[in-house]
């Protein structure tokens, strides 16, 4: 049977207090120099590398489920239909691709709500910084958006350290298999 982790009152409050004009997720933006990536950058390669790393982070494969009759805070359960394609996206900056355009697109992406039927995170590869192609050694921005109900500052930093590495030859993380059994809330 699947282990259920109930949200604390504090974490649940981030869900309850969220509105359409006040999303309560946290975002980080990483700027990467793709000329330092062994073998170069491609979006499909980045997505494939993320797929390996996300297999080691169960939090990124869990979604919320309401408690029986919705009498208590929601619980985290394995998303049995988890699909990385729903979470990792690619977008190009309009010319000239400077700080103003990057800030505008990041602000827009940050204003969009997360789909509560899925794990509460998204990642966006933002290509075209300074009008350069990241496949040809240009810079790349990566915006990661995670709901505050799922992470706090320390947890977010730990997750980012699992997703990213500064060692190009670092071994892949050990996968954590999906929970066995069926979702007891179904």
Regions found by a protein language model. Give the residues of each.
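Non-catalytic N-terminal regions of enzymes
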Residues: 1-186
């Amino acid at each position: 049977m699947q282990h259920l982790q109930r949200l604390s009152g504090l974490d649940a409050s981030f869900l309850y207090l969220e509105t359409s004009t006040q999303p309560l997720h946290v975002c980080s933006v990483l700027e990467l120099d793709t000329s330092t990536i062994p073998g170069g950058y491609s979006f499909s390669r980045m997505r494939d590398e993320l797929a390996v790393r996300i297999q080691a982070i169960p939090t990124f494969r869990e979604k919320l489920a309401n408690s029986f009759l919705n009498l208590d805070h929601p619980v985290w359960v394995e998303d049995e239909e988890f699909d990385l394609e729903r979470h990792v996206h690619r977008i190009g900056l309009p010319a000239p691709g400077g700080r103003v355009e990057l800030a505008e697109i990041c602000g827009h992406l940050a204003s969009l709500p997360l789909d509560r039927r899925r794990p509460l995170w998204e990642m966006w590869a933002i290509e075209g910084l300074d009008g350069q192609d990241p496949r040809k050694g240009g810079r790349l921005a990566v915006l990661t958006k995670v709901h505050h109900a799922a992470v706090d500052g320390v947890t977010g930093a730990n997750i980012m350290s699992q997703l990213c590495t500064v060692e190009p030859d670092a071994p892949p993380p050990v996968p954590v298999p999906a929970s066995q059994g069926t979702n007891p809330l179904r």
